[in-house]
A protein has these predicted regions:
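Zn2+-dependent cytidine deaminase-like catalytic core
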Residues: 1-18, 163-165
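Active-site proximal loops enriched in glycine and acidic residues that flank catalytic Cys/His/Asp
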Residues: 82, 156, 174-178
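Active-site ligand-binding patch in enzyme domains
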Residues: 25-32, 36-153, 159-162
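A gly/proline- and charged-residue-enriched helix-loop-helix capping module
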Residues: 20-24
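Residue-level detector of structured alpha->beta connecting loops
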Residues: 7, 75-76, 169
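A short acidic Gly-Thr/Ser loop motif
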Residues: 156-158, 167-168
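Short, ordered loop/turn segments at secondary-structure junctions
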Residues: 15, 114, 178-179
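Flexible, gly/pro- and Lys/Arg-enriched active-site loops
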Residues: 167-183
């Protein structure tokens, strides 16, 4: 409006979707006072995140895993629950298809009251691990914001994903559906 008032021709809303995408995390911090949260989960066609016996650590294929790692590399922090950590021992890093670390690594955040084993992969992460009980997600996000974190990638199991969605803290939901049945 100010440019137009001074005689400058203004064409509005050009590539506004792309601009919004670039600004999402910053705008979330400004508008809501917390980081932009992406909640990710993978499921089978029958809606399961894992087989009953826990043997399905990877239910998606290589393309989905590569996409997840690319998205991890754009996040400032990656959140997982202690159940996922104890069951799968994820590295919580962003890696290329050949296994090398991307230059930018998200800070690992583990939620839950149980202890993280001394030999857990999360303890080998390039950034120090943040371990919180996860009982107050708005407080967690406030703490992360105070640390300069603007983009959070939630990659826990159904309990953690549901908690962020239930508390209306998910700005983006990313679901990968594997072409398989686990039930």
């Amino acid at each position: 409006a100010r440019l137009a008032e001074h005689g400058v021709e203004v064409i509005g809303h050009v590539r506004s979707d792309e601009g919004q995408s670039l600004l999402d995390s910053w705008l979330t911090v400004i508008r809501l006072g917390r980081p932009h949260v992406t909640v990710k989960w993978a499921q089978s066609l029958d809606g399961r995140a894992a087989a009953a016996d826990g043997t399905s650590q990877w239910i998606t294929g290589p393309a989905a895993r590569a996409d997840v790692h690319r998205r991890r590399a754009t996040a400032d922090a990656i959140v997982a629950g202690i159940g996922t950590v104890l069951a799968d021992d994820p590295a919580l890093t962003a890696r290329d298809v050949d296994g090398t670390l991307f230059p930018h690594q998200p800070i690992p955040v583990v939620l839950g009251q149980r202890c993280i084993p001394d030999d857990a992969q999360e303890r080998q992460h390039p950034h120090p691990l943040i371990h919180r009980d996860g009982n107050d997600l708005p407080l967690l996000l406030s703490d992360l914001r105070d640390r300069g974190i603007q983009r959070v990638f939630v990659e826990g199991g159904p309990t953690i994903a549901s908690a962020f969605i239930r508390d209306a803290l998910a700005d983006e939901i990313l679901t990968y559906i594997a072409p398989t049945l686990l039930g």
